[in-house]
């Protein structure tokens, strides 16, 4: 039929696969509508608590994760998508957002008015064995408050989490 592409559900030399990379998924329009509704709800709720949205590149220097120490050694050594780019730099697809937001806060700490309330809905990647309900690519809501170590700050985060569940 005119316009048909040489695709096949299975990999062979003559056809391209219609399956996504193992551990990730495609988002068709109906899936995107659901995801967008969830993200919009998260954003509206989080912003009602005074949090501002931020984001960053999915690529980070691999050293950012290696410097976190032995606590995350398994993630750094076994569960990251790390590669050497054309400039001979070791790069990682971010497996979590904490090192990235800490880097961003540190860079602008003299310009920021603390406490800082930021949130993100990052796309994250972990190279682990896909299993039911757990993929290599996922999104999550991160809500961070920097510059306050009070009980009130803890209560605020708990109240925010509670509101998100309603």
How would you label these PLM feature ranges?
Residues 7-166:
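TRNA-recognition modules of translation machinery and tRNA-sensing kinases, especially anticodon-binding
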């Amino acid at each position: 039929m005119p316009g048909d592409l040489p695709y096949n559900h299975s990999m062979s030399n003559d056809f391209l696969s219609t399956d996504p990379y193992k551990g990730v998924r495609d988002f068709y329009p109906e899936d995107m509508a659901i995801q967008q509704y969830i993200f919009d709800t998260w954003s509206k709720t989080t912003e009602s608590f005074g949090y501002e949205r931020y984001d960053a590149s999915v690529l980070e220097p691999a050293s950012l994760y290696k410097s976190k120490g032995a606590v995350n050694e398994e993630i750094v050594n076994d569960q990251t998508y790390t590669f050497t780019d054309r400039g001979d730099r070791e790069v990682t697809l971010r497996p979590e957002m904490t090192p990235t937001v800490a880097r961003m806060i540190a860079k602008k700490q003299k310009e920021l008015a603390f406490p800082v309330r930021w949130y993100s809905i990052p796309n994250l990647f972990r190279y682990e064995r896909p299993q039911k309900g757990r993929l290599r690519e996922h999104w999550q809501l991160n809500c961070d408050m920097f510059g306050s170590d009070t009980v009130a700050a803890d209560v605020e985060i708990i109240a925010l989490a509670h509101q998100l569940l309603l």
